[in-house]
Amino acid sequence: MTDLNKVVKELEALGIYDVKEVVYNPSYEQLFEEETKPGLEGFEKGTLTTTGAVAVDTGIFTGRSPKDKYIVLDEKTKDTVWWTSETAKNDNKPMNQATWQSLKDLVTNQLSRKRLFVVDGFCGASEHDRIAVRIVTEVAWQAHFVKNMFIRPTEEQLKNFEPDFVVMNGSKVTNPNWKEQGLNSENFVAFNLTERIQLIGGTWYGGEMKKGMSSMMNYFLPLKGVGAMHCSANVGKDGDVAIFFGLSGTGKTTLSTDPKRELIGDDEHGWDDVGIFNFEGGCYAKTIHLSEENEPDIYRAIRRDALLENVVVRSDGSVDFDDGSKTENTRVSYPIYHIDNIVKPVSRAGHATKVIFLTADAFGVLPPVSKLTPEQTKYYFLSGFTAKLAGTERGITEPTPTFSACFGAAFLTLHPTQYAEVLVKRMQAAGAEAYLVNTGWNGTGKRISIKDTRGIIDAILDGSIEKAEMGELPIFNLAIPKALPGVDSAILDPRDTYADKAQWQSKAEDLAGRFVKNFVKYATNEEGKALIAAGPKA
C-alpha cells in the first residue's frame, strides 16, 4: 500500500494544505462512479453514453491554448530553451520568477482544503529515460484522462513512487493580475523546469496535461542524447521498427495502423540506446466523422474506461460523431490496450531502421516517395512541410503551406537543430534510411490513392525500394524510384502527371522558394547554415 501520509506531506511541500481527502491512483471503477455521480455540475460532469464511455465537455477550451503557455526564465533555461523571437516566433514565452510564484499561489490555494485526486504515472516506457509524473486535480475526469494517457505503474512501483515532475491542474482558477504581469489572458499553462512543476489555470482542455509532459520530455531527453519525437511507430514480425512523422491530415495514424505490424504508439516516442519507446500509456484520437468502417480500431476502442471530449451526445445517450458544433477537435482518450494489435507488455521495441516523413503536398510538386541523404533528412525534418487546400471566394482552391519544425514545432522546447542532430545520430548508429512520402496531390489534380501510398509504404518496409533503379528530380535534387511493386509507375515522377512539364517546373520553383524562405530562421547557427545546400534550389 502507498503511504497516504507521505503523499499529504509531499502536497504540503508544494503549498497544498488541509486536504480533506486524497483519492490516490483510483481504479477505473472508482473513477466511473466519481465522474458520473449525481450533483456534479458544469465541466466536472460526465455523461454516460451508449458506447459505455463517459463524455465530458471542456467549455470554450476545445484545444490547447498556446498563447497562454509560458516557461520560467532562470539560470537553467536561459541558454537551453528555444525562446520565441522576432525571427522565429514560437510558443516558448519567458515568465519571471515573481509571476510564477503568484500563479503557483493561486493554484495551490485553489487545491487546498479540497478532496483531491492524485494520480502517479510514468511518461516514457524506458525505465532509464522515463519521467515519474504526479498529477494533482480536484476533478475526477481529469484524473481519468491522465490514467488513460500516462503509463500505469504496478502496485510495487507505487510503493516507493518519487515524482520527478508534478502537474497541478487548477482549471477552476483564473489569474486576475494577468494584465499587470504582461500575460496573454487570465488563463495560463506555465512550466518551471528547475522546480519541475506544470501549473494549469482557467483551461479545462485535457490535452494540456498530455502535451505539457511531452514538451518536458522534449526538453530533458535530447540534452542527454536521447531522441524525442512527435511520431507514430510500429514493428514487424521480424522486429523491424518503422517510425512515421507527419502533421495532422498526412496519414500518420492511418498508415502506422497496419494489420501486419504491431503498434508501439501513435503520437509521442523516444529513441534511446535500447530502441524506440512510447511516451504514453494511451491514445488520444480525433473522433470527428469517425465510423466503424473507416477506422475500426479507434471505433472499437470507445468503450467502458474510454473518455470522450466535446462530442455531441443525443438524448438517448448515443454519440453523433459527425456533429462538430462544439468543435471539429472532438477527441477520445483510452488506454492503449483497447487496441488489439499492440506491442506487449511494454510499448517499446528495437532501433528504427525505416524513418518516414509524411507530407500532403497540395501544390502537386513533390514525388510520392523519395529516398533522403543524411543532410536531406535533417533539412526536411527541420522544414516539417505539409500543405492544405483552402477554398477561396471565387471557388479556386489555393494551397496553404505549413512548415512546422520537426513535424511538431508547438511542442519543441529546445532549438529544432538539436532534435535533428539526435535523430540523424541515432539513425546512423542503427543504419536507418529516411524517406519523404507525399500523400497529397499531383498533376492530375487528384490526391495520390491510398492504394498507391500503402504500396509505397510496403516497398519501404520490405526493402524492395532499395533494389529499385533511381532517378533524380531537379530543383529538389531528390532520389526517386523508377518502378515499385504494386504502385502505378506513371505517378513516381511528378513531372509525368502533368500534360505540360513546364507547369510542374513553375510550381516547383514557387514551392522551392517557400522552402528557402522558411529555412532562413535555422541559418542562425552553424548546423543550420550547413544544411542549406541539402534543400531545394530556388
UniProtKB/Swiss-Prot annotation:
Monomer. It holds the Pfam family PEPCK_ATP. GO terms for molecular function: ATP binding; metal ion binding; phosphoenolpyruvate carboxykinase (ATP) activity. It is an enzyme of class 4 (lyase). InterPro entries: PEP_carboxykinase_ATP, PEP_carboxykinase_C, PEP_carboxykinase_N, PEPCK_ATP_CS. Involved in the gluconeogenesis. Catalyzes the conversion of oxaloacetate (OAA) to phosphoenolpyruvate (PEP) through direct phosphoryl transfer between the nucleoside triphosphate and OAA. Gene3D superfamilies: 3.90.228.20, Phosphoenolpyruvate Carboxykinase, domain 1, Phosphoenolpyruvate Carboxykinase, domain 2. Substrate binds at R64, Y205, K211, R331. Its EC number is 4.1.1.49. Its cofactor is Mn(2+). Mn(2+) binds at K211, H230, D267. It catalyses: oxaloacetate + ATP = phosphoenolpyruvate + ADP + CO2. GO terms for biological process: gluconeogenesis. This is Phosphoenolpyruvate carboxykinase (ATP). ATP binds at residues 211, 230, 246-254, 295, 331, 447-448, 453. It comes from Haemophilus influenzae (strain ATCC 51907 / DSM 11121 / KW20 / Rd). Pathway: Carbohydrate biosynthesis; gluconeogenesis. Belongs to the phosphoenolpyruvate carboxykinase (ATP) family. Keywords: ATP-binding, Cytoplasm, Decarboxylase, Gluconeogenesis, Lyase, Manganese, Metal-binding, Nucleotide-binding. Signal peptide: none annotated. GO terms for cellular component: cytosol. It comes from the Bacteria. Binds 1 Mn(2+) ion per subunit. It is found in: Cytoplasm.
